[in-house]
Swiss-Prot record:
Record-listed Omega-N-methylarginine modification sites: R359
PROSITE patterns according to UniProt: NOP
Region (Disordered): 457-594
Feature: compositional bias, Basic residues: 580-594
Keyword vocabulary terms for this entry: Acetylation, Cytoplasm, Isopeptide bond, Methylation, Nucleus, Phosphoprotein, Ribosome biogenesis, Ubl conjugation
Main location: nucleus
Protein name: Nucleolar protein 56
One annotated Gene Ontology cellular component of this protein: nucleolus
Coiled-coil segments: none
Length: 594
């Protein structure tokens, strides 16, 4: 009997399921199709043998890449070798992907089957998977699939933020719309303010400058010599400023109320802000085009190149277009009208706005437009598919167009394309090396800054974490020092050596003589048995026979000890101690006098 198992790959892990006999399943294929939708009937056909969950999202991505490439991952190998029967001839494994089935059959030796009833079983498993695996909900399964799908797509598609052409499409569309709006609003300001100061329209032609002047002047009767300097700043022409001042004194315009002037000034300020935003947007578009399509920008200009990209839909679509399509791009209406009426087709579309076609003679406009479209197609392909974008090729292509234009006018033979491209390749390699070196420097600087920041954070965190243990150590060291001081004081009292105390006072010698004599008399009379008793009774009564060690003791403490030791000694010992001490005193005085 051949056992049929089904392998199901999910975003959360691998699942191995067992089915009934192959013959029985194949005979009941219509019943299988019906029972797939019903969970109860599906449980009678399929049972879960093993489930191997992925440890992390990175492991899930690795397994997904392996399955898509037809490679048996170690996790899949471990699952199949562990849970499938050892007799491989009696096992039939159903898989959804023929590539992974062929890899399993080649590496592990299991017979694999795809299609037919296996596809229906996998459809049912996919539908009821969250019910087959314990602890898995439909929501968590959907989240896992979504996350794995995003990570898998990011790995497959090389996405570069700096090469996004969507911003160029939106920017050029907004720029065209702003031009229309600024023109319309400026005409409205001219008509509105013209009732009060009609002579200003004839003096100033620029819309933005007119709106600034209308905002600054306001009531023309208030214009005087003091405002002449500001007028020169706005018009950037002293003669025009003087003419405006003279015209305001003899203007034929009607008077206007204050509320009307407020509305005119408010609307003029809006138009001025729109014109300023238009300038900043144009600067942004130029910088974006130099990043995304530097060769096309160098060849035909930022505005025309952006319009070509926007009309094509993307830089990739523009690179796919042939030169004939690029030539008439933007003139589709005229093209289809000419085809319909069997007239002459247009010679150029959006590329007409470039300076080359305007400089060419009437008979050469078609020829130069065809040549320019060819170079634009090459430049767009270089920009689209080059790893390091550079404007070297665009500059060389522009030189070729200039040479062709001069050839049409003067007959001067241009350089060959092969020589120009060889020169461009050398310069492009140098420019690419320079760009990569700059990028590496920037990356190194960024990494250094990041390391410094992390080191500062680590130092601050270590200081914060070590502040509390240090406080604990300080508090614990204080009682330890007190404990250490006690035994240090005891030997000083008992007559231990302390080199820090100077040997200067003569009183210490007197006390030392008394102590030494008493200790010697006690040793002679008491014998060996009396010494341990004395130590047990009072440890402070221990004496030191070395005169150097005993000389360091303080006089007051020794007197106290001597008074304490008097009752301990017996009567005859006491008398002997007194007599010996008197003799010692006399001897000590004689030694001092000598």
């Amino acid at each position: 009997m051949v056992l049929l198992h089904v392998l199901f790959e999910h975003a959360v892990g691998y699942a191995l399921l067992a089915l009934k006999e192959v013959e029985e399943i194949s005979l009941l294929q219509p019943q299988v199709e019906e029972s797939v939708l019903n969970l109860g009937k599906f449980h009678n056909i399929v049972r879960l043998v093993a489930f191997c969950p992925f440890a992390s999202s990175q492991v899930a991505l690795e397994n997904a890449n392996a399955v898509s490439e037809g490679v048996v991952h170690e996790d899949l190998r471990l699952l199949l070798e562990t849970h499938l029967p050892s007799k491989k001839k009696k096992v039939l494994l159903g898989v959804g992907d023929p590539k992974i089935g062929a890899a399993i059959q080649e590496e592990l030796g299991y017979n694999c089957q795809t299609g037919g009833v296996i596809a229906e079983i996998l459809r049912g498993v996919r539908l009821h998977f969250h019910n087959l695996v314990k602890g898995l909900t439909d929501l968590s399964a959907c989240k896992a699939q979504l996350g794995l799908g995003h990570s898998y797509s990011r790995a497959k598609v090389k996405f570069n933020v700096n090469r996004v052409d969507n911003m160029i499409i939106q920017s050029i569309s907004l720029l065209d719309q702003l031009d229309k709006d600024i023109n319309t609003f400026s005409m409205r300001v001219r008509e509105w303010y013209g009732y009060h100061f009609p002579e200003l329209v004839k003096i100033i032609n620029d819309n933005a400058t007119y709106c600034r002047l209308a905002q600054f002047i306001g009531n023309r009767r208030e214009l005087n010599e003091e405002k002449l300097e500001k007028l020169e700043e706005l018009t950037m022409d002293g003669a025009k400023a003087k003419a405006i001042l003279d015209a305001s004194r003899s203007s034929m315009g009607m008077d206007i109320s204050a509320i009307d002037l407020i509305n005119i000034e408010s609307f003029s300020s809006r138009v001025v802000s729109l014109s300023e935003y238009r300038q900043s947007l144009h600067t942004y578009l130029r910088s974006k085009m130099s990043q995304v399509a530097p060769s096309l920008s160098a060849l035909i200009g930022e505005a025309v190149g952006a319009r070509l990209i926007a009309h094509a839909g993307s830089l990739t679509n523009l690179a796919k277009y042939p030169a004939s399509t690029v030539q008439i791009l933007g003139a589709e209406k005229a093209l289809f009208r000419a085809l319909k009426t069997r007239g002459n087709t247009p010679k150029y579309g959006l590329i007409f706005h470039s300076t080359f076609i305007g400089r060419a003679a009437a008979k050469n406009k078609g020829r130069i437009s065809r040549y320019l479209a060819n170079k634009c197609s090459i430049a767009s392909r270089i920009d689209c598919f080059s790893e390091v974008p550079t404007s070297v090729f665009g500059e060389k292509l522009r030189e070729q167009v200039e040479e062709r234009l001069s050839f049409y006018e003067t007959g001067e033979i241009p350089r060959k394309n092969l020589d120009v491209m060889k020169e461009a390749m050398v310069q492009a390699e140098e420019a690419a090396a320079e760009i990569t070196r700059k990028l590496e420097k920037q990356e190194k600087k960024r990494l250094k800054k990041e390391k410094k920041r992390l080191a500062a954070l680590a130092l601050a965190s270590s200081e914060n974490s070590s502040s509390t243990p240090e406080e604990c150590e300080e508090t614990s060291e204080k009682p330890k020092k007190k404990k250490k001081q006690k035994p240090q004081e005891v030997p000083q009292e008992n007559g231990m050596e302390d080199p820090s105390i100077p040997f200067s006072k003569p009183k210490k010698k007197k006390s030392f003589s008394k102590e030494e004599l008493m200790s010697s008399d006690l040793e002679e009379t008491a014998g060996s048995t009396s010494l341990p008793k004395r130590k047990k009774s009072s440890p402070k009564e221990e004496t030191v026979n070395d005169p150097e060690e005993a000389g360091h003791r303080s006089g007051s403490k020794k007197k106290r000890k001597f008074s304490k030791e008097e009752p301990v000694s017996s009567g005859p010992e006491e008398a002997a101690g007194k007599s010996s001490s008197k003799k010692k005193k006399k001897f000590h005085k004689a030694s001092q006098e000598d």
